[in-house]
A protein has these predicted regions:
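Mid-to-C-terminal alpha-helical segments outside catalytic/metal-binding sites
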Residues: 3-41, 45, 57-116, 122, ...
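Active-site gating/metal-coordination segments in enzymes
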Residues: 147-303
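Active-site neighborhood of phospho(di)ester-bond hydrolases with catalytic His/Asp-centered motifs
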Residues: 43-45, 154, 191-193, 233, ...
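Catalytic metal-binding/acid-base residues of hydrolase active sites
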Residues: 48-50, 235-237, 284-286, 330, ...
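Acidic (Asp/Glu)-rich catalytic clusters
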Residues: 139-146, 174-187, 218-228, 274, ...
């Protein structure tokens, strides 16, 4: 969007007083009554509000779920992926449509909550979210989780590795999300997505174009410095590591440009460390794009906790300055589920008991990898417990609580590094149990750090810290008041 148009919107937003942004929850009359705030800060450090237009759906379905290139006339998997892609794009509002809606809200022509409440939204998880306006997804999150002070949604950029192209570019995502940050009164501030392959391809086409507003690095830097974003999102399972990408040469599905990634990522990390910009990375061994099909051990679990630890060992200047959230902390909920299955199998002498034992051993190795890396770099590496939606029985919830409490007792440093997140978990029936499950899994004296204090330290939200200063400037630019959660952050013990 051009600068003059953006300035006009800022003046208009300030002129109408942004009243809806000052008290957003009270305006959601169509939702259940807002309960009292908990006695601790609550930050959802890992969530999503994007829709189908932001994701290369066909490529994602091909590579992640079906592990096919999508090539070939008779490729049935590709046909199915294209159908899913078509349905998602058909139902999701286009970028221009939503941009016009957001601009009409910013200029006071439309009340966002009236528009939201007059539409029937299924809130049925991923599929419903994929077809909604992004603003509606944000308002739904606020209604489902009214206790949450700050939501930190992550954008996505997987096009280059998936051999497909989303309908919305990363730059368009950034511009649209800025409006949502303003309209929600600072309840949302996100991570801008970055893909090193996109930058490498851009540099090949425009070797002298780093200063262009179209440069991927320039887009994410501007997003953080000027547009209300608080960090950077990386998705290594697409086919890259934080360091040592030359070792991926020859792995199945890896782009031949992989050896060039290190220089691009080094530039990004240097900037993040200097400006105190946090990074969130998908670190769970899941959602990989074919690379794991290779037999070479170097191809396994790209972006693992160990590889992030190696980054700090190779670049000690990053320690304490470049903070990274290792997303999905080893899926400890699945480990609890598999442990119970193994106990049942051994008690009943089931024939699959040996297979379950091997699976449980592999699961515990993944959790151990997170713990070891976080122990080695306690001021740099964090992790979130997000998308833990498998805790669907009382027995499993108790097992998860037992496992987590024992884990934290054995590794006390985790209490200062684990953070709360929801990821995709958006169903109304699951919202309250999800929060309760997380609370039950941790000792009461660690609730404050887990739900807010650790995230505030990771993001740099306290008064005088870099992210806080950038957000204060962002609110001044748009002429809106500082959010209430500023005071809650400053009054929360560091943990």
């Amino acid at each position: 969007m051009d600068t003059k148009r953006r300035q006009l919107l800022r003046f208009a937003a300030a002129g109408v007083g942004m009243g809806f942004a000052a008290s957003p929850l009270e305006a959601l009359a169509c939702r259940p009554t807002t309960p009292a705030k908990p006695n601790h800060l609550l930050i959802d450090v890992h969530c999503h509000i994007f829709n189908a237009d932001d994701l290369a759906v066909r490529g994602f379905a091909n590579h992640i779920f079906m592990h096919t290139s999508g090539r070939g006339v008779l490729n049935i998997g590709n046909w199915l992926s294209q159908m899913v892609d078509w349905l998602g794009q058909l139902s999701a509002p286009g970028i221009r449509t939503e941009t016009r809606l957001l601009e009409s809200i910013l200029t006071g022509q439309v009340d966002p909550y009236d528009a939201y409440c007059r539409v029937e939204h299924p809130h049925g998880g991923i599929l419903a979210q994929a077809s909604n306006y992004r603003l509606h997804n944000a308002l739904a999150m606020m209604a489902l989780y009214p206790e949450t002070d700050l939501f930190v949604p992550a954008m996505v950029d997987m096009d280059a590795h998936l051999g497909d192209q989303a309908l919305v570019t990363p730059r368009q995502q950034v511009d649209l999300m800025e409006y949502i940050f303003v309209i929600t009164g600072g309840r949302f501030h996100g991570y801008a997505a970055f893909d090193p392959l996109r930058q490498v391809r851009y540099d090949e086409k425009r070797p002298n174009g780093r200063d262009s507003p179209l440069s991927p690095l320039r887009i994410v830097k501007r997003a953080v410095m000027e547009q209300g974003f608080v960090g950077i999102k990386l998705y290594p399972p697409m086919g890259f590591r934080p360091i040592g990408n030359a070792a991926l040469d020859g792995c199945k599905g890896i782009n031949p440009r992989a050896p060039k990634y290190d220089a691009v990522l080094r530039e990004l990390f240097d900037w993040c460390a200097a400006e105190r910009v946090p990074v969130i990375t998908h670190c769970n061994d899941s959602n990989h794009a074919n690379v794991h099909d290779s037999e070479n051990s170097e191809c396994q679990h790209v972006g693992s906790p160990r590889q992030w630890a190696q980054l700090y060992e190779s670049h000690p200047e990053y320690r304490g300055h470049l903070k990274v959230d290792l997303g999905h902390f080893g899926r400890a909920d699945m480990h609890s589920r598999n442990r119970l299955k193994l106990l049942d199998a051994e008690r009943e002498n089931w024939p699959n008991a040996p297979d379950l034992a091997r699976q449980h051993a592999e699961d515990m190795k993944e959790a151990a990898g997170f713990i070891a890396a976080m122990a080695a770099h306690p001021e740099s590496l964090f992790a979130d417990l997000s998308n833990y939606d498998t805790l669907d029985t009382d027995r499993l919830r108790k097992a998860f609580s037992k496992d987590m409490r024992e884990m934290i007792a054995a590794h006390p440093h985790l209490a200062r590094q684990l953070m709360y997140g929801t990821d995709w978990f958006m169903t109304p029936q699951g919202a309250v149990p999800y929060l309760d499950n997380m609370r039950d899994a941790l000792p009461p004296d660690r609730h404050g750090p887990f739900y807010g204090a650790n995230a505030a330290r990771f993001l740099g939200l306290r008064r005088g810290e870099a992210t806080r200063r950038r957000l204060e400037a962002f609110y001044r630019k748009w002429g809106i008041a500082d959010p209430d959660w500023f005071q809650r952050v400053d009054s929360t013990p560091a943990g």
